[in-house]
Amino acid sequence: MAVVHCLGCGLVGAWVAKRLAALGHQVHAYDILPHRVMGIDGITVHQGDVLDNLMSMSNNGQVDIVVNMLPGDIGHMATTDLAESRYRVVDLSFSKHTPDRDNQKAQDYGASILWDVGIAPGLSNMLLAYADRAIGPLEKAEVWVGGNPTGPYGEWKYMAPFSPIDVIAEYTRPARVIRQGEEVVLPALTQRHMVDTGEHGEMEAFLTDGLRSVLKSIPAVEMSEFTVRWPGHIQKFIDERESGDLNEDELIFEWSYDHKIPEFTWMKVRAQSRNGKILEWEVEDHGGDDGHSMARATGMVTACCVEAWLKNPDMLPVGVHAPEVLGNHTISQIIRAMKLNNVRIDGPEISFE
C-alpha cells in the first residue's frame, strides 16, 4: 500500500484521510487543528502550520502522493508551492486562482497536479466531458449543486458543509459563464430561479463561479453553474450585504455545521447537443455513519482519484491537469464506488467506447 500525505483535516479532509487509511494506505495528516483524525489507525498526525511543513514532508518518510484539502487561498498557496516539487498532487482546494497558471512551473520541476477533484467542480466536469465526447458539440451545459439541511432550518436556512469562508467567497466572486460561445462575466447570485430537487421539492438556484476549467476545455454555446439553496437564504444574504449589516465573522459562526441536523447534497448535470440530444445525471446523498453528505460526495471523488492514480502511476504526465482529462474508465470507477457507498446516481451509464 501507498504512503499518502493529506494536507488539511477539515470536514472533507478528515473524511478523505480516514477513507484512505481504511483502504490500507499509510496516511500522514497535516493540520493546525487535527482533532478529527487523532487516534485513527493508520493515520500519523502532524500538528502545525501546514505551509511550513510542505517541503519537509519527505522527512516523515516516503511520499507516494499528496492530497491538498486546505481551504481557499491557503490551499492555493500550497498547490503553488507543490508545483516546485516532483510529487503527484491531488488538489481539492478552491480559490479564485486556478492551478493551471502553474502548469509551466510544474513541468519544469516535474510535478503532476490533478485539480478540482470534488463533486462540483470535479465529477461535474467529468460528466460534461463525457457528454461532449458522446453527443457533442454541446449547445447547452448546466450544473446545479448544493449541500443543505433537509429542511429550511434556522434563521439562515443553511449550514456550511465545508469552510464558511469558501462559501462567502463563492457568493461574492463574479461568475464566469459561456454565452453565445464566448466567456462572459456575470454578477454572482443572479439568474435566480426555482429548481425541482425531487423529494426535497422546489429550491432556489443562482449563478456562481464553479465552471472553472470547463470554460476553456469544453466548447458549448451556453454553459452555467448554479448553487442551490432553500428559498429565502440568498435574499437574506443580499439584504444584509446591501444594508451594511453583513458580518463575515458572525456568518462563520452562524453557518457552522451542526451534525445533529439532517442534511443532504444534491447535484444535477445536464448536457444538450446541438441536434437536441440530452444527457442528464442526478446525484444525491444523505450522509452516513462515516460522515455528512458533502464530505462523502466530495471526498469519494477525491479518494477515487487518489486510488486510480496509485494503481496507474502513468495516468497523468507532469504538469497541471483538470478532472475532465480523466478517461471514461476512471469516471466509471468513481461512479461505481459512490453507488457502492449508497450515493444515489441516476443517469446514463458511462460507455467505454
Question: Language-model segments: which ranges?
Answer:
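Hydrophobic/small residue at the entry helix of a nucleotide-binding pocket
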Residues: 12
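Conserved N-terminal Rossmann-fold NAD(P)-binding element of oxidoreductases
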Residues: 4-8
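NAD(P)-binding Rossmann-fold cofactor-contacting core
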Residues: 27-39
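Gly/Ala-rich phosphate-binding loop of Rossmann-like dinucleotide-binding domains
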Residues: 17, 21, 83
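C-terminal catalytic/substrate-binding lobe primarily of soluble NAD(P)-dependent oxidoreductases
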Residues: 134-353
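NAD(P)H-binding glycine-rich loop region in Rossmannoid oxidoreductase-like domains
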Residues: 48-100
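Rossmann-fold NAD(P)-binding glycine/threonine-rich loop
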Residues: 93-113
